[in-house]
Amino acid sequence: MEEKDNTLERQLCFLFYVSSKEIIKKYTSYLKEFDLTYTGYIVLLAIGVEEKLNIKTLGARVFLDSGTLTPLLKKLEKKGYVTRTREIDDERNLQIALTTKGKDIKEPLSNISKQVFNEFDMEVDEAIDLKETLQNFVNKHFQQNI
């Protein structure tokens, strides 16, 4: 960016911030019926229906550290969406899996993205291009710590 681009509206970071905040706000309205935050939503989507995974692997998928994930997973467990079980061979290794209730909401949760997308006046091709651009940006600049 040029040096003269010092106004807030011209800052790339501000555009990311506003986009993220406003999109999450839209998701939040749909997530209320499931008593989920946006972070809880992405964590549930990141866990496969028949999958058991540890916190480190899950954290790498969603770009969250264990300090953020641990309290979130406790809340999701209280709500009946996930189980947290310790490995018999290594009690430090906590395995996360979806419960039946967690599996049952996977489909309705996956439909939320479509509902949010429909709120924007955006062509499908435009959305695909934006997603690919953002995916390339994330892949290039942010490493998942697996």
From Swiss-Prot:
DNA-binding region in chain numbering: 55-78
Gene3D superfamilies, per the entry: Winged helix-like DNA-binding domain superfamily/Winged helix DNA-binding domain (1.10.10.10)
Alphabetical UniProt keywords: Cytoplasm, DNA-binding, Transcription, Transcription regulation
Pfam families tied to this protein: Staph_reg_Sar_Rot
Gene Ontology CC entries for this record: cytoplasm
Subcellular location: Cytoplasm
Molecular function in Gene Ontology: DNA binding; DNA-binding transcription factor activity
PANTHER family recorded: TRANSCRIPTIONAL REGULATOR, MARR (PTHR42756), TRANSCRIPTIONAL REPRESSOR OF EMRAB OPERON (PTHR42756:SF1)
Family in the record: Belongs to the SarZ family.
Protein name (Swiss-Prot/TrEMBL): HTH-type transcriptional regulator SarZ
